[in-house]
Amino acid sequence: MRTRQAFVMGLLLVGAVAPILRAEETARQILDRREALDDTTRKWTDRREHLRMTVRDGRGGERQRELMLYERRLPGGERQTIVFFESPAEVKGTAFLAYTHKGQPAEQWLYLPELKRTRQIAPRSRTESFVGTDLTYQDLDIIQEMAAWSDDDARSSLRGQETVDGVPTYVIELVPQRPDIQYKKIVLWLGRDDLMPRRLEFYGDASEPVKRVQQADLHDVGAIPVARHVEVETPAKGSKTVIESSDAAYDQQLDEALFRTDALERGKP
């Protein structure tokens, strides 16, 4: 099973043990080795973490968001994630819920307290910005799913090896095959020793990336490495979203009721 690992909101893709470097390996074999780690050494059932998001626009403006993220894994590679915004006042009480499915688009809902209404994110709205950040609703789904995509989801190829921030990495190109995915290709830099993503680039029709994601400041929570600093950049807009993670904890025996749509209005437990 190709288990999805989280960014974010984090996204949150994780790695642990050092694999043996095999020069003859294909991209698929590398991704399968990562999957094996996710199902053994790095396996977890649920998690929570605090996130601080700083959104910088192309004109020099800056906004901050504080939120709590809760997530659980289900059999068959399914995930359920809920996010509660805590500050500032204009977004406090906003909540987001996602059911991530293997091989198909996620189901997503957004609760807006000023409207006292929960709306499901329609397919046509998945490329819209997620609460004013550099991430779209579809990006949240892709970042969780992509390292576990099958060959039916995306063609994979190994472009070589590069060093990112002093870390040797595999450079893997993914070409999505599903019509619901907006990007023409995604390039992923995976740490050679821990298979932890260090960089992502998302491409449309042009030769330059439309979005870049960089992960840094990795630390272990038990056997699970977590990126405490993530930057998401949209070059054409000159904007950047910085995500800082703290207080990450795994296997907390979270109540399944926390992941129902009615929990969006109830708020953080």
Tell what function each PLM region has.
Residues E25-R117, S157:
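N-terminal mature ectodomain segment of secretory-pathway/periplasmic proteins
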Residues P19-A23:
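Sec/Tat signal peptide C-region and signal peptidase I cleavage site
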Residues M1-M9:
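Bacterial N-terminal signal peptides that target proteins for export
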Residues K268-P269:
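Short, solvent-exposed mixed-charge patches
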Residues E86, L97-H101, E107-Y111, R117-I121, ...:
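Gly/Pro-enriched, hydrophobic low-complexity segments
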Residues V8-A16:
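Bacterial N-terminal signal peptides
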Residues L69-R73, R155-T163, A216-L218:
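Short amphipathic beta-strand and strand-loop transition segments with alternating hydrophobic
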Residues R28-L31, R63-R65, I143-L158, S207-R212:
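A short, amphipathic edge element
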